[in-house]
Amino acid sequence: MGEEAPEFRVESVALESKDCLQNAIDIGDKTYVISRSDDPKSSITIKILDKLTQTWVVPTVLGAPPNPTSSHSAVLVNNEKILIIEKGVPLNDSIWFLEVDTPFVKQQSKIKGTVVVAWSKGVIGEGQKPIVISGPSGVGKGTLIAKLMKEYPSKFGFSVSHTTRAPREKEIDGVHYHFTERSKIEEEISEGKFLEFAHVHGNVYGTSVEAVESVTDEGKRCILDIDVQGARSVRASSLEAIFIFVCPPSFEELEKRLRARGTETEEQIQKRLRNARAELDQSNSPGLFDHLLVNDDLEACYENLKKLLSLDDDHEDSNDSFIKDGKETACYSILSKTNSEILLQSETNEAEKGTTNLLSLDLSLSGGAPGRTRGLKISPVN
């Protein structure tokens, strides 16, 4: 139930008062009011005015909000999300999106039976696509991944999975797993915060969106070593990734490798073979995997994997250069918007550190809540 609106109309402009700064954005028959008090430690609040019924609604807010600052500027993007630029914050930390009518928000609203909005941090540049590697037990995918990590330690990283099981001896929370309560992981799964999950021996295991995003934030490509069912779940999510299936030259060769381990009983081997046959059958599902790698010879397979990942290509995105040059340390606010771009104006003295006074923000977006919104392109306006 909403509360009756007071007898005043909120316009689609920034409203400043002694106590707060508000941005009111009209989208159809609703006005989204984004408010904060002038206390820099306060968080942003969201209220929605239904203009047809003149009632206020306080939505369920998903995702972590921007860090508290004194003020912000805002503008509507694609009629489905609101771009927020935090004032007084370096550019690379100041860009946020409040999703109000995206597919993710619509899905969550349907699940929860209430009005939902969601925060997503904006990131300049695309970032490297994560890599999903699947394959039956014994095919050698673990060895291939280990070789990648050894040769390119600064380029690749693993996401840390979540589990509800108790830590084993010498296991460290946040290093081996994120150990969590069942109620919490189930709640986050329902909120779409997990790319994939499975119930194993009474416990829940899963890969969260944040675990993958945090690796990308470090400038590395995240590797997900998951089974075919997990790969199917990731493919169905909003995450843009490269999907690779590693297969044996023949089923007989796979059985030979499993038996050569000498670490499992006949019953365990037969179970692994049954699972392997099912995974090999599923690997041919249309649209599931981008590449199939046959691991007949380990070194040859590894070289083919590196070619797939274009590891010899040292191309640098112009946005990466912009960030590395330190130009993102200046503070900006929204000046104007056109159909294809948003102009940002520097709040820093133009003579300081060679700061560019005007920047063009091209909104070629990818991703979004519950993860980051990537693909923002920045260029100076001469």
Swiss-Prot record:
One MF annotation (Gene Ontology) recorded for this entry: ATP binding
EC number: 2.7.4.8
Intrachain disulfide bonds: none
Domain of life from the UniProt record: Eukaryota
One cellular component (GO) term of this entry: cytosol
Subcellular location: Cytoplasm; Nucleus
Keyword terms: ATP-binding, Cytoplasm, Kinase, Nucleotide-binding, Nucleus, Transferase
Chain sites annotated for binding ATP: 135-142, 295-296
Top-tier EC class: transferase
One Pfam family of this chain: Guanylate_kin
Classification via InterPro entries: Gal_Oxase/kelch_b-propeller, GK/Ca_channel_bsu, Guanylate_kin-like_dom, Guanylate_kinase, Guanylate_kinase_CS, P-loop_NTPase
UniProt miscellaneous comment: Plants silencing GK1 have no visible phenotype.
NCBIfam families (alphabetical): guanyl_kin
General function of this protein: Essential for recycling GMP and indirectly, cGMP.
Protein name as annotated: Guanylate kinase 1
Organism: Oryza sativa subsp. japonica (Rice)
